Amino acid sequence: MSNYKFETLQLHVGQEQADPATDSRAVPIYQTTSYVFRNSQHAADRFGLADAGNIYGRLTNSTQDVFEKRIAALEGGVAALATASGAAAITYTIEALAQAGDHIVAQKTIYGGSYNLLEHTLTQFGITTTFVNAHDLAEVENSIQPNTKAVYLETLGNPNSDIPDIDAIAAIAHKHGLPLVIDNTFGTPYLIRPIEHGADIVVHSATKFIGGHGTTLGGIIVDSGKFDWKASGKYGNIAAPNPSYHGVSFADAAGPAAFVTYIRAILLRDTGATISPFNAFLLLQGTETLSLRIERHVENTKKVVEFLANHPQVEKVNHPSLPDHPDHALYEKYFPNGGASIFTFDIKGGKDAAFKFIDKLQIFSLLANVADVKSLVIHPATTTHSQLTAEELEDQGIHQGTIRLSIGTENINDILADLEQAFN
């Protein structure tokens, strides 16, 4: 279906024809733990990766398979792996690339949970991270060490929607034989496809825009199929015979899909952050309307940004669409159709004013999720990024007066009226 446009792909990939077992037009929920093999040789071929297909519910499921194929197609990748959450997708990606004694270079203005994973949790397993100003290309390159295994970015930083120069950083990573990993949760494949700009691996918290309705946890890892694991010489777990899977070289057995096949066969097998069939089904429902929802998110966001930029109680609006934003040129390059419906602004009066404003909102829900059809709000310094030190918060541009908004799809006049009454 490669000739079809995004809006068609989001509806059909993975189930081009009706379900063969039931003739169902909708993707069925295959609520099963196990699959019957035709005979002993068939079972052996499945376990030996000689025959693609279901082995056990912790590894694959037919509902999950449709979801994976669909997101891979939307991102322009060769294969994907769905997980129980976005955090699991990010963790598996790093664990597949780095082992004890290895190093990651990461953009410092990322989601607080990802920052904490890299800064604290993974250090317990011997993986260290250098956080960099992604706008300083020299700093990015100079931070690469002999034991560096990946460069990690977000298409739109959390919470301030800052934008890295993906093309330039991809060139740096590839110069050093490293894959570029990009979290495209906030960008979505409808607005930007990082693989087209040099990304090798794309991750999502599918809980956000892909699901879109605040009902379902899930994550997904997309393999571009473009990184040469053998030529790099740094990833023996993928390119060389793997003793944990009877000597299989995943680069040989799975070809372009080696990366996600390794995660499925080893990390998912051993640690089990498996997405449920029901969650995969719900995320498919969200995927079918992704383009329609994103268009409304973007349209509403433009008007909210304009409203806030002209409000006397607002000190600063952190949105790259504004001409005076330092990433405005990158925004125009990478997001020609708009974007960044999750962003922050600084209210005058600091924390007290921020709390008062948030507590007066009526349509906006105060919660930790983002990218819902409903408008959402939170105070990052005391919640999502509260694990960061005062220095780290300042370094990421998060102040006591910073408020994060996630603009939903409600009527724009109702959204603006709610914001205005909260200021008053």
Regions found by a protein language model. Give the residues of each.
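PLP-dependent enzyme catalytic core of the Aspartate aminotransferase-like
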Residues: E119, T128, P146, R293, ...
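Short hydrophobic/aromatic beta-strand micro-patches
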Residues: V222, T344-D346, S406-G408
